[in-house]
Amino acid sequence: MRRLTLTTLLFASLSAFAAAGAKPPAAEKYDIDASHSGIVFGWNHFGFSNPNARFDKIEGSVQLDKGDLSKSSVSVTLPVEGLDTGVAKLDEMLKSPDFFDAAKYPTITFKSTKVEKIGENGLKVTGELTVHGVTKLVTLDAKVNKIGIFEIPGVMKAPAAGFDATTVIKRSDFGVTKFVPAVSDEIPVRITLDAKQMQAKS
């Protein structure tokens, strides 16, 4: 009995030591599902209207640490050619050298540098935004919509995570100054992201 007790205690001690030294689960990669994500920005046009445009093409991923969201990160690339206002002539103007200059700067990128958890579902995501060849730190006010399993029976089943975020940027900070201030310098941005572990589909 004494030998059994000592063996049990030794095993328990070793197990506790191993658990204490074990590394926490690493963040897992979730690919952005462009078909269910969107980035919309708007501006004031000479005081008369407030048009919007969107980016239809979104590439990137979320490194999601479900145990500690502050250890998560996000990386997004937007091909400027995917910009869509619904008006072909306006699309052409916004992609021209007067604005985004898509030929010279074909992508917009965002890479997070810090994630802070705010309350139950809130996040403050700080990162490097590169537009028009200029990189600036911006902060997104974000919220977690849902983390769980996305399933369409018989079609697919995959771990998924959804987020919404907003921010306001000054386009002049990125060297895009055409028509400022008649066309607003401050640009509100709304983001919704759906990210999935697509390799898990079945």
Task: Walk through the language-model features, giving the residues of each.
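Bacterial N-terminal signal peptides
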Residues: T7-A16
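Low-complexity, acidic/polar, glycine-enriched regions of mature
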Residues: A19-S202
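Positively charged n-region of N-terminal signal peptides that target proteins for export
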Residues: M1-L4
